Amino acid sequence: MRILLAWFSQSPGTENLISALKDAGHEVVYWVGGGDDRKIKIPGTIVHTHNAARNGLPAPGIDTSKFYPPEEALIKQLYETESLVLTMMNKRFDWMCVDERKHTYYNTLQYWNGVMNQYCPNVVIFSVVPHAPFSYIIYGLARLMNIKIILFDTISRVGVPDSDRILMSLGSWESSSPLLEALEKNKGKNFSLEDLSKDLQQYYKLHTANYSGDPTPLCIKEDKDKYSGFRLAALKAKMVAGSIKDFTIFEKTLAYIQKLFRKNIKQEYVSLQSEPDFARKFIYVPLHYQPECSTSPQGGIFVDQILMIEVLSASISNDWLIYVKEHPVQWLFRGLNFFSSRYRGYYKRMSKLKNVKLMPIEADSYALIRHSQAVATVIGSAGFEAILRSKPVIIFGHPWYQYCHAVFRVGGVESCKEVFQKIVNGFSVDQQKIINYLKAFDDVSVQGFAAISQPMAERLKKSGREEMQNIIETLLPELVKYS
């Protein structure tokens, strides 16, 4: 098989993966995502760094003179891809206007369409759900050209150190056929908690009512620690030193002073927030951090989280409320300036909707889940944490737990009203079915290791090659089916 590999070089053992693929008789014609920090040369393989691809630069040695601008027909066939890619640009190209983003998209499409036609891969393999503009264009082209797609979705067990799970999907990130097959195979069987791997047992116990541990995700704890106290001071000192070095200190100081007198996203949010009333019936909606993969592409049209809340608002009865809470690290990572994913008036639009209340960002998310009648999310981990607490979940995207009992996917007001009525009528969560689902998930996912922040990254160096071996052992048998 001729393989285009979209795999980040930060993943330990990636070169082992390429060697394993070649030893199995496959040809890795193109590797994008590799070699950011090292000059890697692999005979017979084009190596394209992630940074170069992200910035629209071609791989070394690629002749682009015959990579022509995309045809109108191709652009029309990829309208959905284009729509999502434009939102992905909020991360690195927030400063671009819509017209510049569209032209950048056309240029990127031109390059990758040329690559696909020149190197003719039979299979495209992604290390993650594609969520960079260039990688999602590769994904869109592969689907259009009927090229086989294999991708791996990392599901973070971030409340349990060193225990990510990696789930393989075939053909689309929207569903996992291996997981569906495992569910069908286990149909009619009941499993106990002891039948699960130890990491999933611990995860389950961590989020059930009679367990005393702290369920706060490890990544959230580490991120808050990184942006507080001495570490925050050190980070700011480093930024100041860098600004002095590149002579931008005066420009940035002026911009900072001006910012002090302008309204920011936190001020807008705080001016609209209110305390929760647990005596009322409500649906809890924890917002996703944006821009990120969890909403673009995995949320589809509901990358617009206001649209999600509008659907909920139009679907519930007047005596119910919707409690919305911002993601705990949204302002830490992106700062307090308005930007494309949190524009001026963003929170105001939400708060004006019928029965919608904004909760303080420091409000206890687990208390909100516990006192709610249901939780609604695009694909957030709060959804699965809710069903472990026997709360039904409304989802708008395609998370790994989408096939689980007590999870209801909706796409608009009509389907949302039907789900709301089930909840009103007293829908009950069956924990046995949750354990059965985890067993199927356990059977088809492979052990991974977290690499979200620096302490985790250090652990990853020790265990990443074991993770890669797990992936290789899952991937190679699947490729045999395609041969």
Short names for language-model regions:
Residues 20-113, 117-118, 157-254:
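Conserved N-terminal ligand/cofactor-binding loop architecture of enzyme catalytic domains
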Residues 340-359:
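Nucleotide-activated donor-binding/catalytic signature segment of Leloir-type glycosyltransferases, i.e.
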Residues 13-26, 311-319:
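A short, Lys/Arg-enriched amphipathic alpha-helix followed by its capping loop at the start of a domain
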